């Protein structure tokens, strides 16, 4: 029963991730090619574009998963890390660096201060006071994202246990907990602060905040680069998105197979 629940949680968590990812992938392809069938009149990715992206990601994920942990998954993960460092370095150097550094430290402090209250408070609005807006925000952001991440717990826990075999506890804590958290903070601070600075300074004039969420990153780079360089960086980001989605999906496939086979890594004995 526990294995079944873990499998369902992994499937649901991955589905949300891939759903968001293929939308951003479609927006990236549109930013590169300008093909009108990729987005509708409101700027949102079309159903056809998302289906094409989904087929592409799932096909690549299956091929990667079949190659095993030490081949396709490791190879794609190395590409993913290299491209991630390149994109983050770009925003650190060419983005709103000073504003981003301020945002980085303010965000850490606000997170530490707000986390206890946000972890224990559930707002219930009555339609007449500010708590109604807080309830709507909490449901759309805090509760939704926490539920999404919690659904990833069985998948990520088992995957980290598998790839961390032979590592010390110190190596695990630093490599799987501290460094990824810092990278996420740097990413949100520098990429987010660059977009916010463009809006506050009047350069964007609403182009970023009014864009579909899947296209906001590409709107940001369009504003800080020439058209040719923006297309080039869009290609890098699209490839990065694909490696993120494929490595997430193929790792999930690997863990689902392990759960379904009762923990056996040979995946020959079903456990359902």
Predicted segment positions?
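Loop-to-transmembrane boundary segments
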Residues: 1-15, 268
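Membrane-embedded alpha-helices of multi-pass transport/permease systems
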Residues: 19-22, 26, 246-257
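Alpha-helical transmembrane segments
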Residues: 68-72, 161-170, 249-271
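Membrane-embedded translocation segments of transport machinery
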Residues: 9-167, 174, 179-240
């Amino acid at each position: 029963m526990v294995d079944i629940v873990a499998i369902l949680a992994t499937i649901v968590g991955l589905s949300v991730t891939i759903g968001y990812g293929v939308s951003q992938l479609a927006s990236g392809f549109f930013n590169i090619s300008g093909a009108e069938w990729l987005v509708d009149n409101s700027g949102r990715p079309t159903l056809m574009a998302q289906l094409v992206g989904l087929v592409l990601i799932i096909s690549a994920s299956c091929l990667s998963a079949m190659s095993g942990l030490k081949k396709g998954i490791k190879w794609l993960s190395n590409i993913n890390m290299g491209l991630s460092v390149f994109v983050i370095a770009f925003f650190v150097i060419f983005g709103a660096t000073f504003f981003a550094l301020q945002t980085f430290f303010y965000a850490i402090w606000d997170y530490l201060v707000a986390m206890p209250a946000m972890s224990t408070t559930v707002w219930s609005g009555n339609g007449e006071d500010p708590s109604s807006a807080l309830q709507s925000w909490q449901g759309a952001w805090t509760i939704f994202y926490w539920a999404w991440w919690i659904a990833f717990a069985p998948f990520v826990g088992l995957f980290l246990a598998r790839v961390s075999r032979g590592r010390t506890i110190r190596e695990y804590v630093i490599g799987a907990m501290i460094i990824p958290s810092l990278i996420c903070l740097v990413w949100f601070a520098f990429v987010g602060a660059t977009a916010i600075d463009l809006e506050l300074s009047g350069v964007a004039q609403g182009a970023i905040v009014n864009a579909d969420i899947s296209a906001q990153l590409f709107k940001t780079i369009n504003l800080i680069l020439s058209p040719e360089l923006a297309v080039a960086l869009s290609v890098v980001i699209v490839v990065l998105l694909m490696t993120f989605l494929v490595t997430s999906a193929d790792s999930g496939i690997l863990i689902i197979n392990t759960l379904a086979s009762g923990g056996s890594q040979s995946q020959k004995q079903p456990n359902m």
